Amino acid sequence: MVVLCKNALPLLVAAIALASCVEDPYSHTQPQLVVEGWIDDGDFPTVFVTTSLPFTTSDTTDVDLVQHVLKWATVTVSDEEKSVVLTGRVMKHQTPPYGFTTTRIMGRSGHTYKLTVDCPPYHAEAVTTIPPKAVVDSFTVTPCLENDTLYQVMAHVSQQLDLPQGGGYKFFGISKCRDVNYKSCYMGLYKPENISPHPALPVYNLHRPDNRHFSPFFSYSDTLKIKFTTLDGPSYAFWDSFEDDVSLSGSPFFSTNSNLRGNVSGGLGYWCGYGSSVYYLLPPKKP
């Protein structure tokens, strides 16, 4: 037995050496420009600029992610009146933790905003229009009958808006005990035909990539800040593909390996104008 082990050792060493010489098949993937940006009615633009992280067989560290942030990009937002270069700054609690913004241009419903990003060799452009502002008439907040630790939210909307072609409505939210930034509400996207007189639209829990025990309802520890927005056609298409990806990512029967339907020419990502209204909700009294 000892002799067999000694004879096998050189083969094992050779196998390890051979494996170390095998080239990572994804190591030469060319990075692409990635733009994530939005401008709300009555608020200032926010833009993040990175390069795509290639598929790889090796582990990815936080250092690797930071190296994909393009801090020296020139980011410009233009409307019908002026063109403004945004200022780069550290943004704590964001991913990535560095972005671009300005107080010299503010979103207004009915106005169109062009985004330009230059960081040689990359150049990207995108255009978005902020639709009329969405308004919720009232919210109904009720305990869940099946679980006394959870509650559910319904939004009552009667407003009929003339939205851009292909546009729609979306809910975002913040749980004040857990979040700093808005997150997408699960299945929170609605077409105009869903907004009939006095409908009750369910507002589901927030999508968190690290949440392995998801419930569509909210915990009694959640004090909510809900943003109800209108979207133009390209913005709706992006969030529609995002929700498809989230919904199907856990299914073994459907593939979700396609890119999201962004509206950035010259790169990946989105530039969205939001006609937004913000509401604060408290948990109901426990039954």
Mark where each language-model region is.
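Sec-dependent bacterial lipoprotein signal peptides
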Residues: 1-19
